[in-house]
């Protein structure tokens, strides 16, 4: 069950409207690593979790907080679009608005009535393919660290793209929360790795072709990666290096398709 409160988690009001910054913020809302991806990933992982209650609760806590971040960014975008120009009358009144109108996301006015959308800045819709919920919490926690890292990186870049103190205030809060989320997911990952092992999944090592499991194969014309040779991996084994990987699989010969498929291949 979710219960909404009308108060935002943190301030989300700019000093002035800025439709171009509104477009940029769409990446943190509807982009691959944005808050919608975090919200849906963590909630899905939490709902799928049947193990230790602390991990389930951690995921649901954080997924629900991401809802608040979606709300904050959507609100900020709405404020940034207040009084934004969108028609020829605006341009006639003030020709200097041409640059602003050229930099705006046309979908903000055309599709969403000068409101936020679940798209990235170029209008590509957010999609569920960005979400990870594998049922394996070691893998999922690793994804979560990456998601928070990418999100924080993008927020850092957005911070440098504006001098609006209201926008920056919200971004400072998001930076801090993404610090917390990185750290908590790293801690959960470490605990789960101690229990299940470093490699995901940890119960297949007995059947894999282990002679290939710690070989760094040189598939480029550089040799810089040879520096890893002899170093100890996190599982305690040493890396070896293969200068010239060999083709061991032979030449495939697949029979032609059924004539009804019309695969005319010469």
Swiss-Prot record:
<comment type="subunit">
    <text>Homohexamer.</text>
</comment>
<keyword id="KW-0479">Metal-binding</keyword>
<feature type="binding site">
    <location>
        <position position="66"/>
    </location>
    <ligand>
        <name>Mn(2+) 1</name>
    </ligand>
</feature>
<feature type="binding site">
    <location>
        <position position="220"/>
    </location>
    <ligand>
        <name>Ca(2+)</name>
    </ligand>
</feature>
<feature type="binding site">
    <location>
        <position position="148"/>
    </location>
    <ligand>
        <name>Mn(2+) 2</name>
    </ligand>
</feature>
<dbReference type="InterPro" id="IPR012347">
    <property type="entry name" value="Ferritin-like"/>
</dbReference>
<feature type="binding site">
    <location>
        <position position="222"/>
    </location>
    <ligand>
        <name>Ca(2+)</name>
    </ligand>
</feature>
<feature type="binding site">
    <location>
        <position position="218"/>
    </location>
    <ligand>
        <name>Ca(2+)</name>
    </ligand>
</feature>
<dbReference type="InterPro" id="IPR039377">
    <property type="entry name" value="Mn_catalase_dom"/>
</dbReference>
<dbReference type="InterPro" id="IPR027407">
    <property type="entry name" value="Mn_catalase_C"/>
</dbReference>
<feature type="binding site">
    <location>
        <position position="181"/>
    </location>
    <ligand>
        <name>Mn(2+) 2</name>
    </ligand>
</feature>
<comment type="function">
    <text>Catalyzes the decomposition of hydrogen peroxide into water and oxygen.</text>
</comment>
<keyword id="KW-0575">Peroxidase</keyword>
<protein>
    <recommendedName>
        <fullName>Manganese catalase</fullName>
        <ecNumber>1.11.1.6</ecNumber>
    </recommendedName>
</protein>
<dbReference type="GO" id="GO:0004096">
    <property type="term" value="F:catalase activity"/>
</dbReference>
<dbReference type="InterPro" id="IPR007760">
    <property type="entry name" value="Mn_catalase"/>
</dbReference>
<dbReference type="Pfam" id="PF05067">
    <property type="entry name" value="Mn_catalase"/>
</dbReference>
<feature type="binding site">
    <location>
        <position position="35"/>
    </location>
    <ligand>
        <name>Mn(2+) 1</name>
    </ligand>
</feature>
<feature type="binding site">
    <location>
        <position position="66"/>
    </location>
    <ligand>
        <name>Mn(2+) 2</name>
    </ligand>
</feature>
<feature type="binding site">
    <location>
        <position position="57"/>
    </location>
    <ligand>
        <name>Ca(2+)</name>
    </ligand>
</feature>
<feature type="region of interest" description="Disordered">
    <location>
        <begin position="243"/>
        <end position="266"/>
    </location>
</feature>
<feature type="binding site">
    <location>
        <position position="61"/>
    </location>
    <ligand>
        <name>Ca(2+)</name>
    </ligand>
</feature>
<dbReference type="InterPro" id="IPR009078">
    <property type="entry name" value="Ferritin-like_SF"/>
</dbReference>
<feature type="binding site">
    <location>
        <position position="69"/>
    </location>
    <ligand>
        <name>Mn(2+) 1</name>
    </ligand>
</feature>
<feature type="compositionally biased region" description="Basic and acidic residues">
    <location>
        <begin position="255"/>
        <end position="266"/>
    </location>
</feature>
<dbReference type="GO" id="GO:0046872">
    <property type="term" value="F:metal ion binding"/>
</dbReference>
<keyword id="KW-0106">Calcium</keyword>
<keyword id="KW-0464">Manganese</keyword>
<comment type="similarity">
    <text>Belongs to the manganese catalase family.</text>
</comment>
<keyword id="KW-0560">Oxidoreductase</keyword>
């Amino acid at each position: 069950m979710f219960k909404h409160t009308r108060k935002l988690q943190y301030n989300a009001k700019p000093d002035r409207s800025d439709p171009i910054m509104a477009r940029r913020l769409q990446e943190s809302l509807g982009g691959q690593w944005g808050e919608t991806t975090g919200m849906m990933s963590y909630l899905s992982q939490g709902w799928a979790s049947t193990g230790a209650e602390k991990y389930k609760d951690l995921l649901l806590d954080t997924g629900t907080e991401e809802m608040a971040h979606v709300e904050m960014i959507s609100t900020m975008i709405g404020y940034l679009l207040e009084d934004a120009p969108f028609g020829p009358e605006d341009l006639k009144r003030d020709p200097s608005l041409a640059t602003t109108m050229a930099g705006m996301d046309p979908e903000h006015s055309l599709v969403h009535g000068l409101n936020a959308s679940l798209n990235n800045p170029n209008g590509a819709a957010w999609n569920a393919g960005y979400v990870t919920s594998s049922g394996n919490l070691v893998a999922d926690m690793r994804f979560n660290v990456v998601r928070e890292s990418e999100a924080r990186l993008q927020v850092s870049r957005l911070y440098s793209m504006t001098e609006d103190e209201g926008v920056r205030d919200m971004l400072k809060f998001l930076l801090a929360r993404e610090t917390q989320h990185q750290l908590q997911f790293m801690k959960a990952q470490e605990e789960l790795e101690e229990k299940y092992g470093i490699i995901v999944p940890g119960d297949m090592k007995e059947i894999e072709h282990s002679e290939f499991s710690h070989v760094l194969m040189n598939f480029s014309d550089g040799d810089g990666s040879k520096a890893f040779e002899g170093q100890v991996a996190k599982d305690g084994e040493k890396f070896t290096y293969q200068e010239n990987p060999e083709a061991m699989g032979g030449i495939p010969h697949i029979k032609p398709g059924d004539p009804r498929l019309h695969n005319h291949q010469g």
